[in-house]
């Protein structure tokens, strides 16, 4: 009598890798045939929750399609394949189970936030109806949630440093899962499904901007190549702490984040490679700092587990009642990179053109939107969700809560000074000139404050404020301390009157936002 093969369906989501993948590892050990499955869930390609921005923008979609394509190639080399379907996972799985007839289990990695856990609940319900096993694992963090040195997730500290010290002294990182040279095969007769195109999602395939700091492709293969390059071929990891606040080029930071977001590389694998590098090459503050940043990623994921949907609420984790604004003209100026503050504008244009922005840039543009403009932080968070190639729900919302002063920042009223930050991290103005071509003829650090230039300097730079480049839509009093003073106009004088919140420059206070972008104003 022929015994039917045991088939296990492996639903892959943000774990698009073969290495250190407990879902595939468990299925390989417990099935005769396995079905790796990725679903293009239509719920990922609609509008965001509050402001209806597209959920998945062209840069991340491109990276996702590349990652899916790469994983399929890798699985084929191992004697398997990746099934691709368009549809809700719970419905696709139910159809597959009925089609195959001998599925014994469905397995997947758990996520932390509501939309993802809702999918898990729906898949579990489908498995219950069908009478098959539902098996989940936790594999997205460096430290496993069951190994945290806290009695319950509700005891997670609300300050990162306390969390970090606890896990570093009391926690242990689990070893990675090793995969065999060959995987169990797929059942016969299954259509593999084609990799969709941008057009299938009513989008255009974005061109690669030659200025981008992230000219990389998606996929596990590319992630592992990047690690090999950054660690072993160039030793760049040994100077990471000194270069991580860079703005231009590929190698100022690890650039692991996009691959981590889709699970193309495992944080535990990075950790193992750091340990190997420290034994064979060198151990210093820079090698430790890579782990330090991975712990931030862990922390925001565990914060999401602790607080649930509150990470998306207007009042944040601290339940603060802040009178946020929803001024569409101010927000448009921010997102389009035409605030008149060059450091903000350069970063926002880089994001729009490439899907990437440095960590330093993200902190600054978030501070500017929330602290200088007073705009609802969720507008910024959802805009990042749309555009970032490395969008990770927990890190994105955790960082925005932090920047807005309603998250895990132990310091009250942290506010970035756009001029000081720009001069500290782009003292020569090279980053400004790269992304704000209107200012290319302004030399040195003066590119950060074009409104402070004399009329002669502006004319020499072929710059007409209010026409070829806008005046700042707000001014913060503290900026004046960092401006290379030229013959001062009333803008500088008003800014030097004292500390306080950012304000519309006094002589234009009542003119409205349209004034700053009109080509016909009489200054």
UniProtKB/Swiss-Prot annotation:
Protein name: Cryptochrome DASH
Sequence ranges assigned to domain Photolyase/cryptochrome alpha/beta in this UniProt record: 6-142
Sequence intervals crossing the membrane: none
SUPFAM superfamilies linked to this entry: Cryptochrome/photolyase FAD-binding domain, Cryptochrome/photolyase, N-terminal domain
Region feature (Disordered): 174-211, 486-523
Gene that specifies this protein: cry-dash
Basic residues compositional bias, start-end: 496-510
Swiss-Prot/TrEMBL cofactor(s): FAD; (6R)-5,10-methylene-5,6,7,8-tetrahydrofolate
Xref: PROSITE patterns: PHR_CRY_ALPHA_BETA
Keyword Flavoprotein: yes
Role of this protein: May have a photoreceptor function. Has weak cyclobutyl pyrimidine photolyase activity when expressed in E.coli and when tested in vitro.
Cofactor binding: number and manner: Binds 1 FAD per subunit.
